[in-house]
């Protein structure tokens, strides 16, 4: 899903706009926008049979353009109280809960088995009784909703939504997968913990470069 970064950017802007009325509703707005874009991606891919990387690459540019347009012409003001939600313990609990829930779903539920089956072979999965289209759409919706949560985290950390919010996040996602040794083509042998390990390695590497004072160009090169 190459549109993850753009989803974060647009969901962050939506949350920023709604936060002036209600911060809890801003969370709902971020998750809702993310899930909605995920639904669009899933339907375009599953129902119209367009390759997922083509669909999500198109939506990546479309929604990034919307983020730039909205933030440039209609900047959103956020209340100072938004920083009260920038709580390390709270965010840690949310992340751990999401990771644990993802592990349980991926390893021990029917949905997880269906996802792995589709990754191994769509035709075989369909013959075994898996509703391929519905499962794919659901996967995109979940990914979009999680991007919405990330968008709210970005908002409470910076207090604003900018044109650069979530920019290049899709690249970081791919790097995390590769660092974790996960096959980007998926399949029955996919290891959920490899995703977590890859994300942690990328975070440690990025933060380490910042701590040693590496300039942005050097960081990007590495």
Model regions and ranges:
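Transmembrane alpha-helical segments in multi-pass inner-membrane proteins
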Residues: 161-221
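Hydrophobic alpha-helical transmembrane segments
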Residues: 6-10, 24-32, 54, 92-97, ...
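Transmembrane helix-bundle core of multi-pass membrane transporters
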Residues: 48-111, 137-138, 157-166, 218
């Amino acid at each position: 899903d190459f549109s993850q970064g753009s989803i974060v950017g647009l969901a962050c802007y939506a949350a920023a706009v709604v936060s002036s009325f209600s911060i809890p509703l801003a969370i709902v707005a971020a998750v809702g926008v993310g899930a909605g874009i995920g639904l669009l991606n899933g339907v375009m891919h599953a129902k119209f049979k367009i390759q997922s990387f083509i669909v999500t690459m198109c939506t990546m540019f479309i929604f990034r353009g919307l983020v730039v347009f909205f933030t440039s012409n209609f900047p959103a003001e956020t209340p100072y109280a938004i920083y009260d939600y920038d709580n390390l313990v709270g965010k840690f609990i949310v992340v751990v809960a999401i990771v644990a829930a993802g592990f349980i779903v991926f390893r021990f539920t029917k949905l997880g088995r269906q996802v792995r089956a589709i990754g191994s072979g769509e035709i075989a999965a369909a013959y075994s009784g898996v509703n391929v289209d519905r499962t794919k759409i659901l996967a995109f919706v979940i990914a979009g909703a999680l991007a919405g949560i990330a968008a709210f985290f970005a908002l409470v950390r910076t207090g604003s939504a900018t044109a650069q919010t979530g920019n290049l996040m899709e690249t970081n996602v791919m790097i995390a997968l590769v660092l974790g040794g996960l096959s980007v083509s998926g399949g029955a042998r996919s290891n959920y913990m490899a995703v977590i390990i890859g994300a942690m390695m990328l975070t440690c590497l990025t933060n380490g470069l910042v701590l040693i004072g590496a300039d942005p160009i050097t960081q990007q090169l590495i």
